[in-house]
């Protein structure tokens, strides 16, 4: 028997925003496994808003930095792992509405679900307020990352870093293959294998787009190669 979820008013305190339309927050915390009124459209909206706000903040902070470094810094800040870390810090798993299958498999701890919930909250706050309000909320959430981040190779995305690591070791480039897709065309979940020469089993990654799944698989490969170096 699952424990009752805390009231969403507690979540409002955590995220730093009080909703006029409580239904938006409820929808943002509802996974597609739990209801047909789920958070994926809000996630889509929040993803775009988050990217814009972080891009604008980096553009203003680094007036002389080239586009490539700006893109890499933005990718590092808004990547799935970064969003999942924020979602865990907020305790979003305690507030999520999940179907029985996801509950049994520990979906409230899954990084992809937590990251999607963060983006859905952003979309919900935007619809409940305006661009200025959500901009300030996002800047408050990501203030530590925006303060510490600097241009450089450490901000390159996982696929780029994996490619450079393999090239440095004089190995062929990795190969990415989509091995499974779930869901309908507008809300699919992708599973990708990343194959590296000399390693028998491919590295798996999942995500709501092929690109996200490839980055997740590349991250798994990087971690293995760095640990075994």
UniProtKB/Swiss-Prot annotation:
Source species, domain of life: Bacteria
HAMAP family: RNase_III
Localization per Swiss-Prot or TrEMBL: Cytoplasm
Organism this protein belongs to: Idiomarina loihiensis (strain ATCC BAA-735 / DSM 15497 / L2-TR)
Residues engaged in binding Mg(2+): 43, 116, 119
Taxonomic lineage: Bacteria, Pseudomonadati, Pseudomonadota, Gammaproteobacteria, Alteromonadales
Subunit structure: Homodimer.
Protein name: Ribonuclease 3
Residue ranges of every copy of the DRBM domain listed in the record: 157-227
Entry's family note: Belongs to the ribonuclease III family.
EC number: 3.1.26.3
Function: Digests double-stranded RNA. Involved in the processing of primary rRNA transcript to yield the immediate precursors to the large and small rRNAs (23S and 16S). Processes some mRNAs, and tRNAs when they are encoded in the rRNA operon. Processes pre-crRNA and tracrRNA of type II CRISPR loci if present in the organism.
Domain RNase III: 8-130
Gene Ontology biological process: mRNA processing; regulation of gene expression; rRNA processing; tRNA processing
Disulfide bridge partners, by residue number: none
